[in-house]
Structure formats: C-alpha cells, structure tokens
Amino acid sequence: MDYQNRAGVRFGGGGVAGYQETNAARRERLRKLALETIDLSKDPYLMKNHLGTFECRLCLTTHANENSYLTHTQGKKHQTNLARRQALENKKSQENAPQVLLGISQSHVQVKKSVVKIGRPGYKVSKIREAESGKFGLRFQIKYPDIEVNAKPRYRIMSAYEQRVEAPDRKFQYLVVAAEPYESIAFKIDRAPGKFWSYWDAPTYTIQFFYNLTKIS
C-alpha cells in the first residue's frame, strides 16, 4: 500500500495506515487464517441456497461467496450468537442431568435380592421379673443357626391395625422379628411395654422388656 503522498509524511518514509486500512488488513488476515483452519463442510450453520449464495442459519444473513461468509463468522454478531447458543445448550444439559441421575437412583432402589426362605426359626418365650423394681416382663430367645453371613436379626413394633391375621384390638400390638433367610415371626404383646432391650449373640437373638406393672397375666 502506497502511503508516500499522505500529508505530513516524509518522502521515502513508511506512512501510518488509517483506521479503515488497518481494519481491512485485519479482516483479511482473519479470513486467511479461517481458510486454513476451518472446514466449511463441517459448519452446521452454513447453507447454500438455490440462488447459489450462502446463508448463515445462526444469524439469518446472506453472503455472496465463501470468503464473505468466513469474514462474517469472525465478526462480533456471529461470535455473540455462538456464545448465546452454547450457553443455551449448557443450560439444557444441566436441566437434564438431574433427571438422568434420578432415574438411575430409582432403578437401584427398586432392585431387591431374591431370597429363598427356609422356614420359621425356633424360639422360646419366658416370663421374667426385674429384681429392683419388681416389674414383670417377657424374654424372647430366637435361634438363627443358618442366618446369612454378616447379617443381624431386626425387630420392629407393629400396631394391631397394620396386621391382617386377626381382627384389630387396640389393647395389643405385635413384636415382629426378621432375619434372612428365615421367615418373619410375630408375637402378640400388650400395648405399652416399658424398658426394652435386645442382644445378638449368634445364633441366639434375645429381646426382653418390662411392663410398668407388678404383675403379668
């Protein structure tokens, strides 16, 4: 580019390029760089229409040739729209992620190991009395010689309205004991026991409690 005839420039010296020339040179460098690094055949936003011109589907602009389109892709409008599209896609992926994780966790929860039951365990029920208070209670000793390795029996108190074996009687509740691979067993007890205690000393599981009474029927 000849800058010799510019005002204020010495003859034979290099002139200072103006804004338009500098900007044009910059666009040309970007275009050449884009030609070397961008494969237009893989650009999802480039479309050649029936008139032979090129369209940017992201910005809805029309371009006479590939060079014009490449120049457009380096501009502010195209880069801004690309950033917005990427942000939108990231947001959608984050919204979908919890649903996928939730589906996986639910599938794990629903998986239940199938255990072949081997029948009811042997047990012994005894009436007991606390020496200090004189209160009476019950002791349950249940045998689990074939319990699963590292397993431990469990118990829970069931209300009369949860069971389906007898007509509900609010004066009673049920002590339910379970241990794989044995069948669960239940004992009908008075409604309000006091002190409660359990102990597992394989193969015997012991449960005992005392009523707030000084006699027991």
UniProtKB/Swiss-Prot annotation:
Q: Does the keyword Magnesium apply?
A: no
Q: Name one GO molecular function term.
A: RNA binding
Query: Where found in the cell?
Result: Nucleus; Cytoplasm
Q: Which Pfam families match?
A: SF3A2, zf-met
Give the main localization category.
Answer: nucleus
For this chain's UniProt record, which GO biological process terms are given?
A: mRNA cis splicing, via spliceosome; spliceosomal complex assembly; U2-type prespliceosome assembly
What keywords tag this UniProt record? Cytoplasm, Metal-binding, mRNA processing, mRNA splicing, Nucleus, Spliceosome, Zinc, Zinc-finger
Zinc finger Matrin-type: from-to: 54-84
* Source superkingdom: Eukaryota
Of the GO CC terms on this record, one is: U2-type prespliceosome
Tell me if Cytoplasm is a UniProt keyword of this record.
yes
Biological role: Involved in mRNA splicing where it associates with cdc5 and the other cwf proteins as part of the spliceosome.
Per the similarity annotation, which family is this? Belongs to the SF3A2 family.
According to the record's subunit comment, the protein's assembly and interactions are: Belongs to the 40S cdc5-associated complex (or cwf complex), a spliceosome sub-complex reminiscent of a late-stage spliceosome composed of the U2, U5 and U6 snRNAs and at least brr2, cdc5, cwf2/prp3, cwf3/syf1, cwf4/syf3, cwf5/ecm2, spp42/cwf6, cwf7/spf27, cwf8, cwf9, cwf10, cwf11, cwf12, prp45/cwf13, cwf14, cwf15, cwf16, cwf17, cwf18, cwf19, cwf20, cwf21, cwf22, cwf23, cwf24, cwf25, cwf26, cyp7/cwf27, cwf28, cwf29/ist3, lea1, msl1, prp5/cwf1, prp10, prp12/sap130, prp17, prp22, sap61, sap62, sap114, sap145, slu7, smb1, smd1, smd3, smf1, smg1 and syf2.
State what protein this is by name.
Pre-mRNA-splicing factor sap62
